[in-house]
């Protein structure tokens, strides 16, 4: 099992990343793989490949997200918690 918070904590080490959430997406080979949904800090740039490579250097290969999607903001509920269900609806397709 891969715990999204563990992967998120690694990605948060990148100075360009303001927010990130990791969700599972269907995969024909593995059943499910990770996808990071990231918000960059204003004026910052980083590529999907750079985030994936950074993860490869810091966590086990099987935990590395297979893709990264960039968004302007993460959906949150009134308590301020990220609504991962909404992210899965928008970005959860393979």
Identify what each model region corresponds to.
Residues 1-63, 72-75, 80-90:
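AMP-binding/adenylate-forming catalytic core of the ANL superfamily
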């Amino acid at each position: 099992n891969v715990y999204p918070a563990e992967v998120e904590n690694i990605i948060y080490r990148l100075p360009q990343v303001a927010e990130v959430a990791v969700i599972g997406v269907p995969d024909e080979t593995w059943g499910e793989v990770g996808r990071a949904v990231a918000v960059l800090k204003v004026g910052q740039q980083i590529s999907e490949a750079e985030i994936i490579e950074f993860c490869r250097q810091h966590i086990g290969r099987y935990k590395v997200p297979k893709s990264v999607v960039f968004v302007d903001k993460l959906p949150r509920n009134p308590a301020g918690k990220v609504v991962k269900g909404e992210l899965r609806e928008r970005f959860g397709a393979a």
